[in-house]
C-alpha cells in the first residue's frame, strides 16, 4: 500500500521528466498512486473498458465527468429517475454554468429522440435506477447516442460489472459509486469512471487539477473487496429475488419491484442486459408516508441507513430521507412515492431478513 502524499526522485532529471510526462514516475497522489491504479486497473478489466480514473466518491466521478465534457450553453439528456444528489446537480448547480437538462421517461426510451437538441452533448442514465429500480434499455439508448454522435454515460452502480456491462451496449463511459457493492461492507468511500482512453484522459486532466482523488487506503480496501465481488453478488441476488417473491401479493403492499420479477414493467429488458436482478428490491406501502415511518421504526434486525450494497440488510424510506428536499411533485416525477421502501438485501439468512420485514409490516 502506497500511503503517501508524494513520491521522491533520485535526481533532478527524473523529476523534470516526470513533470514533462516523458517517464511514468508518480509525482503526487492527487495525480496518481500505484495502489489507486491497481484498483482502477481491476475495474477497467471487469467493465471491458480501455482506461479509468478513480475518485473520492461516486458523486465526485459523476461531477468530474460532467465538468469535463459540458460547458456553458450545453444540454444534457438524462433518465428522469436519478439519485437525489445527481438530481441536485442538474437542478441547482448546472444552471450556474448555463448547462440545461431534460428528463426522459425511463419506460419510454422511444420518446427520448424528441428531447435531443442541437446543443445536446451527453446522454446520462442509471439502470437500474435509484431508488425506483426502473430499468432503462441500454441498447436503444446506445443506438440513439451513436445516431446523433452524443456522448453516452451510464451509472452502473446498482448492477456492478458482475451483472451488467454497459459498454457492450454502446456506452462511452461507465461510472460507479464504489462505496456500494464494490466495497460491500460499508467501510470506505470511492468512485470511478471507466471507458474510452481518450475520454478518460480528459477526465484525468480535469480531476488532477480539481482534486477529487481517491485515498490510497480506500483504494486498497476496494481492491481487496473485488476479490469477493462475484460470490457476494450471487448471495445478494439469491436473497433479493427470494425476498421479492415472498413479499409479492402481501396485503399491506401496493406492489413489489425487482428487475427479475416477471411483474416488473421492464422484465424482458432486464433479462436482456443483466445477468441477474441485483441485490435491491423496493415495495410500496399502502398506508403512504405515515406507514413508511411506522415500518422503519418497527424493524428489529435490519439497519436504517442511507447506504446500500452492504453485507447487512439495509432499509431506507426515500420520501423522508434521500429525496426529502424535493417537492411532492418532483418526488413523483422521479418515481418516489410516499410509501416507497428501498431494501438493500444483505448476506444474512433469508428467513431472518424476511421475518423482520413481515413482522414490521404487521405493525403498519
Set out the residue ranges of the language-model regions:
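PLP-dependent enzyme catalytic core of the Aspartate aminotransferase-like
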Residues: 91-92, 100, 114, 118, ...
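Conserved PLP-enzyme active-site core in the AAT-like
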Residues: 51-252, 257, 268
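Short, well-ordered beta-strand elements within core beta-sheets of diverse protein domains
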Residues: 222-231, 279-286, 341-346
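Short conserved active-site loop signatures built around small residues
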Residues: 1-2
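Conserved N-terminal alpha-helix of the aminotransferase class I/II PLP-enzyme fold
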Residues: 9-60, 85-92
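Positively charged, small/polar-rich N-terminal and surface patches that mediate targeting and assembly
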Residues: 8, 34, 194, 255, ...
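Conserved small-domain helix->loop->beta segment predominantly found in fold-type I
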Residues: 241-309, 326-332
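Short amphipathic alpha-helical segments
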Residues: 24, 50, 189, 218, ...
